Amino acid sequence: MSSINIALDGPAAAGKSTIAKRVASRLSMIYVDTGAMYRAITYKYLQNGKPENFDYLINNTKLELTYDEVKGQRILLDNQDVTDYLRENDVTHHVSYVASKEPVRSFAVKIQKELAAKKGIVMDGRDIGTVVLPDAELKVYMIASVAERAERRQKENEQRGIESNLEQLKEEIEARDHYDMNREISPLQKAEDAITLDTTGKSIEEVTNEILSLL
């Protein structure tokens, strides 16, 4: 499948990254986690004391994606591997705000388009099918109930040793949905030619097989 690109979009904790990794593995394609790119920039934003001059921040940022056979995609921010810090609560709380800024979006989208130019890419995010890969051969818009998404996020946090409250996670996910869908730049929306896939109550394998059956 080195001659096609696959775009997976959807709201927070809909299972995009997990499924994208599995689909890429099954098809021997390269998985690109665009959310990690925005999280890396958010991490730098926080480390620099939340500066509001995003043009300056981006102009002084170097971002690279590398691939490790064991650990998978790694994010190098200014030549340092920051991958293990990107799921911290503080980063999660600020990433929507940072990702909504035009300099940040333009910077990340440029890198994403360059990565996808050679084809053979599975990419997940919120504007992949609409902005980054409008010509992707397969576009899937993944959804799931807020309750299930909160439970998934709590399990992810537990695996990473991060404490979280389920009800608070539900509120945060609902707030994130509203923010992502209503921001001016690259709002979360389904591409006209995308196929909607509800992952509520489905296993990783079931969802993976459904997507593979669309090819």
From Swiss-Prot:
<dbReference type="GO" id="GO:0036430">
    <property type="term" value="F:CMP kinase activity"/>
</dbReference>
<keyword id="KW-0067">ATP-binding</keyword>
<dbReference type="GO" id="GO:0005829">
    <property type="term" value="C:cytosol"/>
</dbReference>
<comment type="similarity">
    <text>Belongs to the cytidylate kinase family. Type 1 subfamily.</text>
</comment>
<keyword id="KW-0418">Kinase</keyword>
<dbReference type="InterPro" id="IPR011994">
    <property type="entry name" value="Cytidylate_kinase_dom"/>
</dbReference>
<keyword id="KW-0547">Nucleotide-binding</keyword>
<dbReference type="InterPro" id="IPR003136">
    <property type="entry name" value="Cytidylate_kin"/>
</dbReference>
<keyword id="KW-0808">Transferase</keyword>
<protein>
    <recommendedName>
        <fullName>Cytidylate kinase</fullName>
        <ecNumber>2.7.4.25</ecNumber>
    </recommendedName>
</protein>
<dbReference type="GO" id="GO:0005524">
    <property type="term" value="F:ATP binding"/>
</dbReference>
<dbReference type="InterPro" id="IPR027417">
    <property type="entry name" value="P-loop_NTPase"/>
</dbReference>
<dbReference type="GO" id="GO:0015949">
    <property type="term" value="P:nucleobase-containing small molecule interconversion"/>
</dbReference>
<keyword id="KW-0963">Cytoplasm</keyword>
<dbReference type="GO" id="GO:0006220">
    <property type="term" value="P:pyrimidine nucleotide metabolic process"/>
</dbReference>
<dbReference type="Pfam" id="PF02224">
    <property type="entry name" value="Cytidylate_kin"/>
</dbReference>
<dbReference type="GO" id="GO:0036431">
    <property type="term" value="F:dCMP kinase activity"/>
</dbReference>
<feature type="binding site">
    <location>
        <begin position="10"/>
        <end position="18"/>
    </location>
    <ligand>
        <name>ATP</name>
    </ligand>
</feature>
